[in-house]
From Swiss-Prot:
GO biological process, one term: spermatogenesis
This protein's GO CC annotations: mitochondrial outer membrane; mitochondrion; sperm flagellum; sperm midpiece
Species this protein is from: Rattus norvegicus
UniProt keyword annotations, A-Z: Cell projection, Cilium, Developmental protein, Differentiation, Flagellum, Membrane, Mitochondrion, Mitochondrion outer membrane, Phosphoprotein, Spermatogenesis, Transit peptide
Primary localization class, coarse: mitochondrion
Protein name: Spermatogenesis-associated protein 19, mitochondrial
């Protein structure tokens, strides 16, 4: 009975011109809400700190630009990791991706207008800040004996 019903169903679909099985996206989107919310909170906090820092610097250097909202130009900075770095700390890749995403999100944040002569200084300061944080993490991991052993193999 069940086999006959399935055969009739398949033949009916083919006679109408519909494919079997139906072309429906059967993938269920899975979202880890806790992980997403933690990452969003971390990124928002970092964005706010960067925005606050830039606003303070601008207000100190040029008070006449306050109140103007502009979109900061996008500047993608990718810091390449060596094989040795990847071998020593598997979480380094995740950290690097988060840092890159943070910088992209920061560069899209609406902030007070920066005079053109200050734009390069502000961008360079942010790039240096990201590099210092990555370098700080590397220094912390360099004191780890596992780091020394795996780097000597590189």
């Amino acid at each position: 009975m069940i086999i006959t019903t399935w055969i009739m169903y398949i033949l009916a679909r083919k006679s109408i011109g519909l494919p079997f099985p139906p072309r429906v996206n059967s993938d269920i989107e899975v979202e880890e809400t806790e992980a997403v919310s933690v990452v969003q909170h971390w990124l928002n906090k970092t964005e706010e700190e960067a925005s606050r820092s830039i606003k303070e610097k601008i207000s100190i250097n040029d008070p006449c630009t306050q109140g103007h909202d502009i979109h900061v130009t996008r500047d993608l900075v990718k810091h390449r990791l060596s094989k040795c770095d990847m071998l020593t700390d598997p979480n380094q890749e995740v950290l690097e991706e988060r840092t890159r995403i943070q910088f992209i999100r920061w560069s899209h944040t609406r902030i007070f207008q920066v005079p053109s002569e200050m734009m390069d200084d502000v961008i360079q300061e942010r790039i240096d800040q990201v590099r210092r944080s990555v370098s700080h993490l590397r220094c912390d991991s360099s004191s780890d004996p596992c780091y020394r052993n795996s780097c000597s193999e590189c």
